[in-house]
From Swiss-Prot:
Cytoplasmic side: 1-324
Composition bias type Basic and acidic residues, residue spans: 23-42, 63-74, 95-111, 141-155, 163-178, 185-205
A molecular-function term among this protein's GO annotations: cell adhesion receptor activity
Species classification: Eukaryota, Metazoa, Ecdysozoa, Arthropoda, Hexapoda
Tissue expression: Late in embryogenesis, expression is restricted to cells of the peripheral and central nervous system undergoing proliferation and differentiation. Also expressed in larval CNS, mesoderm and imaginal disks.
The family this protein is said to belong to: In the C-terminal section; belongs to the type-B carboxylesterase/lipase family.
Protein name: Neurotactin
Bias (Low complexity) ranges: 11-20
Length: 846
């Protein structure tokens, strides 16, 4: 502890009785004074003090109390200061006259010096005596903070007042519990409170330093918090500051819990004794100022803490740790993921144009915007022009895409209704349609640019002269349910779509004629490549679906170099097995019969002829081909039969069979071929007999080429021909099923299917059964028929989406589609007809 500055104080005279009543100095003080004497060889007159003759005697508690009361009354100076006399060292020599003179003039109390860092064990040298007796030093120091206690002591009521104050200041159980859970000040605040004389700490120290007024009163109890804090504070001592050392407030150590109170008493009696000097007023003033400043600061801090703080201020002052940052980052990431998922699931980007009046929608083409209409949950655009009208000079010219801005439109073209079909001949001999017919229909479930859908191009015609499109019309309901886009184009038919003449060949560059309908379909594929994306379609997934005469055109296009990159796969249903094999020159000579009938010498005359005159001049043998049993006259006229399709040298270079020979096996076939088991059925044939019996079937076979070849009995036995269904099955195998299977066998990767599931009273699988099931127009009435529809749709739409046929196996290439799709090694009846040279000789020709 640092040594306080020495200041002069007025001498205080003490009587012998008072000196005798004072308690002898403690053993610790004696030891410290002896060390000082050893250090200073000549004692200073300022520090010496006459010893009491009765210093060595032990005083009683009663005498101590009396002396204390008398001394307290005399020791108060004019200014109210308390002067505490410290007894001198044990000595027996009486004071001399010189000593008294020095005491009167220069007498002052010098504080005892304790070396800094010295060990102070207050309880080690204590005498064993009961606490009730008290210590003589306890009565020497009084409370300096409380003015009320000073006034009471001056009036003689110190004992009574101190007892009441002690009783009042003792906290109750509730207050102690509340203080236990209150926020504890920091170490720095505790240090400042100790320096400035905190009220709680001083009250405890004063209570210990004040002598017991009444021997019968029990010692004051410490609070629960102090009882806990004191052992912990002494077990883990904190570093003392220089102020603690200089003021004498520090403790050297703790000997035991029993000596804790004595340590505090020694601290008060020894360390605070020098406060008697004249600098006490200044020191007390400074301490009070510091105390007031500390109290004001503490009050300001409490007020600052109690002041309501905004959330933003709290967030700014918050110091987050690494764990807090990771938690916040995880929460933000989770919220972000939820937002992204919600955005993807609920948000619809404006990829589709809005509806007008709730049913009209607009799309864009290369020639201008078009407006479609909503139907059955899908959108239909009907009558979109895809090529220039093939009229006047463009009659018998290859189709040309619209590249002239003068042929386009400025406003939105309303494509709500179907356009007129191309001119054609119906089955009853009437003609319908118009030459300006190169339009197409688009049916799409969505008009959007994201998630493009596969495209199915419907090419249907019962014959190359018409009617078209026949049964092959797009279904809005199935477009929506299967997520595909249907495109159905018009294409030229009859003489307008297939006429090949030498005169036409000579004026064309490159020199070619005929197959104009094929160029129409090629133009459609080019239009799809450029525009289908605006209708929600995928130009990289285009499937050609041909039915009957349309299947024949599809088969030719698959083998043409003109369509490479314009389609992805093809499906041909009930097409013709007789494909063009005649050269262009030979076909041109055969078609000169038309010019002779029209009495035209040049092409200009033909272009000026009306469509009605041209249809009237068309030979009947060009329009109709018998779908019946082969007749004997066909054997001699097979080479002279008319064929609409030719080897034009532009679209069709060679016979498809020559192309198939060069093909290699492919896991994903580009063509699927198929037919129905009873596609030769006609109402005209059925009405020949009301009830077809075995005899009637035999008679009908005998009158055909089969009877001429003597195969009637074999055929009846093989087919069990005793009904109309068996007769139709024989005709279908000869004309269509077996010839198509023969073509499929020439292609290593082409699956072939046969529909055998029947309907109606005769259980016939008619020519349109497969296409009706694909487009949703087949009306099932039994469980077997419903399963057939499901199997047929699964075959087709899986192929459209993935490019493979589920039931196709390389060594079992024939798929028998009954109520289920079953792969088989072969279709047995065909081998018989092939062996008899009937197939493919008498195959149907379109």
């Amino acid at each position: 502890m640092g040594e306080l500055e020495e200041k002069e104080t007025p001498p205080t005279e003490t009587t012998a009785a008072q000196q005798e009543a004072l308690e002898e100095p403690k053993e610790t003080d004696k030891m410290l004074d002896k060390k000082e004497d050893a250090k200073e060889k000549t004692p200073s007159p300022q520090t010496s003090k006459p010893a009491s003759p009765n210093a060595g005697k032990k005083s009683s508690p009663v005498a101590e109390k009396k002396i204390d009361d008398a001394e307290l009354a005399k020791s108060k100076s004019g200014n109210g200061e308390e002067i505490i006399d410290i007894p001198a060292e044990n000595g027996t020599k009486p004071d001399s006259a010189d000593d008294k003179k020095i005491s009167k003039e220069e007498r002052e109390v010098k504080p005892k010096k304790i070396p800094i860092g010295g060990l102070k064990l207050p309880g080690f040298f204590m005498k064993n005596k009961p606490k009730a007796d008290g210590d003589g030093a306890e009565g020497e120091l009084l409370e300096k903070e409380k003015e009320e206690d000073k006034d009471k002591e001056a009036n003689g009521d110190a004992a009574t007042g101190s007892g009441k104050d002690e009783q009042k200041s003792r906290p109750g159980l509730g207050e102690r519990l509340r203080s236990f859970f209150a926020r504890k000040p920091s170490a720095e605040k505790e240090k400042k409170q100790l320096v400035n004389g905190d009220a709680d700490a001083k009250s405890e120290a004063t209570a210990e330093a004040t002598p017991a007024e009444d021997a019968s009163d029990a010692p004051p109890k410490r609070g629960l918090l102090n009882a806990i804090k004191l052992p912990i504070a002494n077990m883990i001592p904190k570093k003392k500051s220089n102020d603690d050392v200089e003021l004498g407030l520090g403790k050297a150590g703790l000997a035991s819990m029993e000596t804790l109170d004595d340590s505090l008493k020694d601290q008060d009696t020894v360390d605070r004794a020098p406060v008697k000097t004249n600098g006490t007023e200044e020191l007390k003033g400074e301490l009070k100022d510091e105390k007031l400043a500390a109290e004001e600061k503490l009050a300001a801090e409490e007020e600052e803490q109690n002041r309501p703080v905004s959330l933003l201020t709290r967030l700014r002052g918050y110091k987050c740790s690494v764990d807090d940052a990771l938690i916040v980052f995880g929460i933000l990431l989770f919220v972000l993921l939820l937002g992204v998922i919600g955005y993807v699931l609920t948000h619809e980007t404006l990829t589709s144009p809005p509806l007008r009046e709730g049913r009209y929608i607009m799309a864009v083409t290369g020639c201008g915007p078009v407006e479609g209409v909503k139907e059955d949950g899908a959108f239909a655009f009907r009558g979109i022009p895809y090529a220039k009208p093939p009229v006047d000079r463009l009659r018998w010219k290859p189709a040309e895409l619209i590249d002239d801005i003068n042929m386009c439109w400025n406003d939105t073209l309303q494509t709500h209704n179907s356009s007129v079909v191309c001119t054609q001949r119906l089955g009853n001999g009437t003609t319908v349609g118009d030459e300006d017919c190169l339009y197409l229909d688009v049916v799409t479930p969505h008009v959007r640019y994201n998630n493009p859908l596969p495209v199915v191009v419907l090419i249907g015609a019962e014959s190359l002269a018409g009617p078209s499109p026949g049964i092959l019309r797009p279904s809005a309901r199935y477009s929506r349910s299967h997520d595909v886009i249907f495109v159905r184009p018009n294409f030229r038919l009859g003489v307008f779509g297939f006429l090949a003449l030498d005169a036409l060949t000579k004026e064309a560059h490159p020199p070619t004629s005929g197959n104009y309908a094929l160029t129409d379909i090629i133009a459609v594929l080019n239009w799809i490549k450029l525009n289908i994306v605006h209708f929600g379609g995928d130009p990289q997934s285009v499937t050609l679906l041909g039915h009957r005469a349309g299947a024949t055109l599809v088969t030719l296009l698959v083998n043409s170099q003109k369509v490479k990159g314009l389609y992805t796969r093809a499906w041909a249903s009930s097409g013709s097995a007789i494909l063009p094999g005649k050269p262009l020159s030979e076909s041109g000579k055969q078609n000169e019969q038309l010019m002779a009938t029209l009495e035209c010498a040049d092409i200009q005359c033909l272009r000026e002829a009306s469509s009605e005159r041209l249809w009237a001049a068309t030979p009947d043998t060009w329009l109709h081909f018998p779908v019946d049993l082969p007749q004997p006259q066909e054997a001699n006229a097979s080479g002279s039969r008319h064929e609409w399709l030719v080897l034009d040298g532009d679209v069709v270079f060679e016979h498809p069979s020559d192309t198939w020979k060069r093909e290699q096996a492919n896991d994903k076939p580009v063509l699927v071929m198929g037919a129905t088991a009873h596609e030769a059925h006609t109402e005209k044939l059925r009405e020949l007999h009301a009830n077809w019996t075995r005899e009637e079937v035999r008679a009908y076979l005998e009158n055909s080429q089969i009877g001429a070849l003597g195969l009637t009995d074999e055929v009846i036995e093989k087919y069990n021909a005793s009904s109309y269904a068996s007769l139709v099955s024989i005709i279908s195998d000869i004309r269509s099923v077996c010839p198509l299977l023969t073509n499929a066998r020439q292609q290593p990767s082409v699956p072939f299917y046969v529909v055998t599931q029947g309907e109606g009273p005769d259980q016939l699988a008619t020519v349109d059964a497969d296409v009706q099931a694909i487009l949703g127009r087949y009306e099932p009435h039994t469980v077997e028929q419903r399963r057939f529809v499901s199997a047929m749709q699964q075959l087709f739409y899986y192929y459209v989406s993935h490019g493979t046929v589920q039931s196709f196996v390389q060594n079992r290439r024939v798929i028998n589609v009954g109520q289920d799709a079953q792969p088989e090694e072969d279709y047995l009846p065909c081998n018989y007809w092939i062996s008899k040279d009937i197939v493919p000789r008498y195959a149907r020709v379109d």
